[in-house]
Amino acid sequence: MKWENNGDSWKSWKVYGKLVKDHILTKHTIKKSDKENIMENHTIVTLKKGEGRTIKAGGAWIFDNEIDTITGTFKNGDVVNVHDFDGYPMGKGFINQNSKIRIRMMTRHADQDIDTEFLRMRVQNAWNYRKTTVDTSSCRVVFGEADFLPGLVIDKYEDVLVVECLALGMEQFKETIVSLLKEVLSEDGISIRGVYERSDANERKKEGLAKVKGFIGEEFDTNVEIVENGVHYMVDVVNGQKTGFFLDQKYNRLAMQRICKGKKVLDCFTHMGTFALNAGIAGASDVTGLDISEYAVQQAEANAKLNHLEDTVHFRCANVLDELPKLAAAGEKYDVVI
């Protein structure tokens, strides 16, 4: 049967999709004559009727209950082609039958190869966006699905990169992406002295992955001093929470500087004291930070000294849920509670 495309319209693609489904994937099975060709172009995953709206609207996940049939053979982590129920090609993503998130999309272009050039393009786009929008001295350079690199986070702390991988399919690309990012950064005169992996979150179990924590490449001093919003921090990328620091809270911390001058402030779950220190540097009269972790409190106190705020900003090891009723019973009052 002959099909002629008279423009890249939704209608013409729907017609094409129906031809594919009716004449190539008859009854959702592979004809022997087509098997070799389809295998070369990856497995085809067809969604149930009515599914796929999320992907068309910009989503990146396909759940197990959205899939109708899988035509072809694959292993977990392989890149597969995704079609809607009518055979319309929706793009490519990697598949993992161990996960409820069965497919994580990498591209919405069915004819796009997932190769080194593709990954470089994704990394370059991610870096270009950060250069346009944020202070890049320390920032989240790669943010998973938002950068079409699903399950992968790469944080930059000055001249150190910290990597967190939470998806099986991304494991095969992880070190290539790190190398490509170092190349992209070097083109802007940025030299990376070390890379550390913090893929130690429990979410990896859902992907059938073991936890990984350690150096990618040569070892280096993993205590990194960064400056954010005028506040200095010593970040421990090995023992700190997540990748060592909550970089995504940068502008929330900055907002504290606008409202805390001359105020009495209580910072709950202070971690490394980031919100408390932003309040202190803005001129708060008195700041108390609470955290249940002794290690976090020690880090927060060290950061207070680093910013010469130890006379104004104080930290205490306590369970916030126990401490708040005690403070209320004692009649303590605060202007700002974080």
Tell me what each language-model feature is:
Residues 35-158:
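Non-catalytic accessory regions of SAM-dependent methyltransferases
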Residues 5-8, 22-23, 28, 34-37:
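Intrinsic-disorder-associated, low-complexity terminal segments enriched in Asp/Asn/His/Tyr and depleted
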Residues 104-113, 162-174:
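Short histidine-centered catalytic/ligand-binding loop motif
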Residues 214-338:
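Rossmann-like S-adenosyl-L-methionine
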Residues 3, 10-13:
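Tryptophan (W) side chains
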Residues 142-155, 174-245, 254:
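Non-catalytic substrate-recognition/targeting regions of SAM-dependent transferases
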